[in-house]
Amino acid sequence: MKKKRRRGSGRSINSPQLVSVTHYEVTDKPILDPDYRRLPDYVKNSIERLHREAQIRPRKAILELEALQEQYPHIPQVYNYLAIAYSRIGEIAKAEAIALEGMQVNPDYLFTRLNYAEFCLYKKDYAKVAEIFDHKFDLSLLYPKRKLFHVSEVVNFMGLIGLYFYETQRQDLAQQYYAVLQRLAPNDPMARRLKRRLSPGLFVRLWKRLTRWSASNQTDGI
């Protein structure tokens, strides 16, 4: 299934300073890079299995992933899954170093950029986040030769950039990115994550109102 994004369709993001009107197709069919396709089937099967194991049995996965990293240093998925595994066991600095190395070795692979950008976002290094994407916040600007993207690429990119805009006090742009996620994948974890930032829960809203009310009363009493 392919979903085409056209000018003026309501799925386009248009902000003259930051992004262009997007024009590319979105598919849910796998898009595999040539290096990955050339791998032996048993290696591809191992990488897919290790993606799951990095999250549920990270220590076991690390041993296999490090062996694959040494043998196939040009395969970006290995770096991403290895970074996930180290994050799961609490070795955040090691995970970040691997994510950075993965991006440096595979600079054109979107998910290595996204993976390292997550660490920078967590550290509130927002200037670095923008630098990672070359200050291009639209996939058609970042990859001008590509006309087709997998839905997971679009969702994760839109979600992370939406979070970046939210954290840098540009909620209007964050809302635009969230609107795209709502149309494309409203139940995706990244869409829900951005929604939580843009629409804090009832308790948070009540707490803010109580804080403002308390501050107002203190001012009136002066």
What are these regions (language model features)?
Residues 39-77, 81:
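Alpha-helical segment of the N-proximal tetratricopeptide repeat
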